[in-house]
Amino acid sequence: LLDGILESGDLARIHLQVYAAELGEGDYTASLNILSGDTIAQIITINLIIDGGELPPILPRYDISSSESGIINLPNDTDPIFFNVANRYTHVISENGDFIPILIQNNFSVDQISHVRNVLESYLVDVEDGEWGSNKAMISNAIGATNAILLLLNDEDEYENPNVWSLMDSGVHGQDLLSTEVFPEGSIEYMNSSHRNATYEEVLHFVHNYGIQIANPSMQNEI
């Protein structure tokens, strides 16, 4: 339920976001009702048509609570489309309890994985009194709803890996990040600034593509 009050002469933009991941094929209708004691009520009809089509594979939510690091090995019964690409898994919880999955190849250390996950979480934390960041719930919820995956790959050779291409061609959305680009604070490479650290950049691409662009059009327009 969306409600609010506009004073006379005020202007507000309302962005409607629809999650269709669990909706079947068909026609759907909703309405936006604008009520006022001083004018005629306005009803704006919203129509949504979902066409049939092949759904992309979806990575199930795995329980990571048994792992001290929050990182687990992928179960052997994982869909081969994912299991042929990565061997470990973790996730970040969105505001509405959905999850944002992270798939991991074997060259990543636990410290590197934790660093990437912490960076993602930091982007989704509210910033009090910030112009755009005071409420990021819709952004984290949008990422979870798209089923997008943060894919941690060993190195550039993985761009020639046919299993990685099969995953992308299946319709799975995501953002890659290489182990050769991740240097946690305190590591030798970080302290010496001897290598390019792309963690913040690539994770921000992930948040932007699957969160900000979907859930916050006003912020996107400013960008």
Model-derived segments and spans:
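Surface-exposed charge patches in extracellular/virion surface proteins
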Residues: 7-17, 42, 60-64, 68, ...
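Short amphipathic alpha-helical surface micro-motifs
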Residues: 28-31, 81-85, 103, 129-134
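N-terminal low-complexity, Pro/Thr/Ser-rich intrinsically disordered segments
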Residues: 54-96
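Acidic/His-rich structured neighborhood in mature extracellular/periplasmic domains
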Residues: 97-223
